[in-house]
């Protein structure tokens, strides 16, 4: 498990405005919790705690949407 930005397809983050949205997204994917990090490295994006290794995370490089 790891703490990381959860990723959609093509290495793109989940943009957010509210912690509830990210906490729900993260826990549905097996994380312990999550929140919306504002003005972070990738803008306003969901950060998850204890996300399982099989769930994609944002890695260095471009978002190819």
Curated annotation (Swiss-Prot):
Alpha toxins bind voltage-independently at site-3 of sodium channels (Nav) and inhibit the inactivation of the activated channels, thereby blocking neuronal transmission. This contractive toxin is highly toxic to insects and barely toxic to mammals. SMART domains: Knot1 (SM00505). Its main location: secreted. Keywords: Disulfide bond, Ion channel impairing toxin, Neurotoxin, Secreted, Toxin, Voltage-gated sodium channel impairing toxin. PROSITE patterns: LCN_CSAB. This is Alpha-insect toxin BotIT1. GO terms for molecular function: sodium channel inhibitor activity; toxin activity. InterPro entries: LCN-type_CS_alpha_beta_dom, Scorpion_toxin-like, Scorpion_toxin-like_sf, Scorpion_toxinL, Scorpion_toxinL/defensin. Coiled coil: none annotated. GO terms for biological process: defense response. Has the structural arrangement of an alpha-helix connected to antiparallel beta-sheets by disulfide bonds (CS-alpha/beta).
